[in-house]
Swiss-Prot record:
Molecular function in Gene Ontology: hydroxyacylglutathione hydrolase activity; metal ion binding
Reaction catalysis annotation: an S-(2-hydroxyacyl)glutathione + H2O = a 2-hydroxy carboxylate + glutathione + H(+)
Species name: Methylobacterium nodulans (strain LMG 21967 / CNCM I-2342 / ORS 2060)
CDD domains named among the record's database cross-references: hydroxyacylglutathione_hydrolase_MBL-fold (cd07723)
Protein name in UniProt: Hydroxyacylglutathione hydrolase
Biological or metabolic pathway of the protein: Secondary metabolite metabolism; methylglyoxal degradation; (R)-lactate from methylglyoxal: step 2/2
Keywords for this protein: Hydrolase, Metal-binding, Zinc
Known EC number: 3.1.2.6
InterPro entries: Clx_II_MBL, Glyoxalase_II_hydrolase, HAGH_C, Hydroxyacylglutathione_Hdrlase, Metallo-B-lactamas, RibonucZ/Hydroxyglut_hydro
Cofactor note: Binds 2 Zn(2+) ions per subunit.
Domain of life of the organism encoding this protein: Bacteria
Family of the protein in this entry: Belongs to the metallo-beta-lactamase superfamily. Glyoxalase II family.
């Protein structure tokens, strides 16, 4: 099984290192901050071979030039990001395969937060590196498309096994929990997770990874097809989940 190290970057970005103990290959999922990634590499003793970019936003790619210069890592980025990602060696599209040593992942194009966003899905290991598409108890802002586009991207996750570990690009768990409780106040599983989030944050940690099963039970954006979430945005049970999602996302923007 792979080894994974998560750590804080900038103020609320989450850095991730994915290490294959069989081959000693190691990938960083985005590089929000060069110093934080380099410190994590020093602490683990891992040698960085790859950088897998989820999307072009500055807070996910700022550290790439320095880290590549220090490590020689190969940079793989979404083709649709164009030249917005620095130092790119290879580009990927829907269905392409990425390898980190013996670990084999598939590229999903998951637009909605931005048009070039991708998720890296490692089926054998049940790992999804979701960037800013799916968060613990939340989802990314819709920035470049109608909300239905992000809903379609999120819907792909619903087909994955419940035990899938989801690694996201930011730690917004407390604000996400507050909104989730407002939207789904009678959800006992959500109440328990919100309490856990408070405890974890007090300890200086974060709820990453989450699992798909936990998110299906507690994340209002993945639960847009549930009657309780339709009612929370003054829609009838059975309403189009994409429309419910759009209303939830707009509410969260103002929350």
């Amino acid at each position: 099984m792979p080894e994974i190290r998560t750590f804080l970057c900038r103020s609320d970005n989450i850095g991730v290192l994915l290490h294959d103990p069989v081959t000693s290959a190691c990938a960083a999922i985005d590089v929000p901050e060069a110093g934080a990634v380099l410190r994590a590499l020093k602490e683990t003793g891992w040698r960085l071979t790859d950088i897998l970019v989820t999307h072009r936003h500055f807070d996910h790619v700022e550290g790439i030039p320095e880290v590549k210069a220090r490590t020689g890592a190969r940079v793989t980025a979404p083709a649709k990001a164009g030249d917005a990602v620095p130092e790119v060696d290879a580009t990927v599209r829907e269905g392409d395969v990425v390898k980190v040593g013996s670990l084999v992942g598939t590229v999903w194009e998951t637009p909605g937060h931005c048009a070039d966003h991708v998720t890296y899905w490692f089926e054998r290991e049940r790992l999804a590196f979701a960037g800013d598409t799916l968060f613990t108890l939340g989802c990314g802002r819709v920035m470049e498309s109608p909300p239905e586009v992000l809903w379609r991207s999120l819907s792909r996750f619903l087909a994955l096994p419940d035990e899938t570990a989801i690694y996201s690009g930011h730690d917004y768990v407390l604000s996400n929990a507050r909104f989730a409780l407002a939207a789904d106040p009678d959800n006992s599983n959500l109440k328990a997770r919100a309490e856990l989030a408070e405890r974890v944050k007090r300890d200086g940690r974060f709820l990453i990874p989450t699992t798909l099963g936990e998110e299906k039970a507690t994340n209002p954006f993945l639960r847009a097809g549930e009657p309780a979430l339709a009612r929370s945005v003054d829609m009838a049970p059975g309403s189009d989940p994409a429309a419910v999602f759009a209303a939830l996302r707009e509410w969260k923007n103002r929350f």
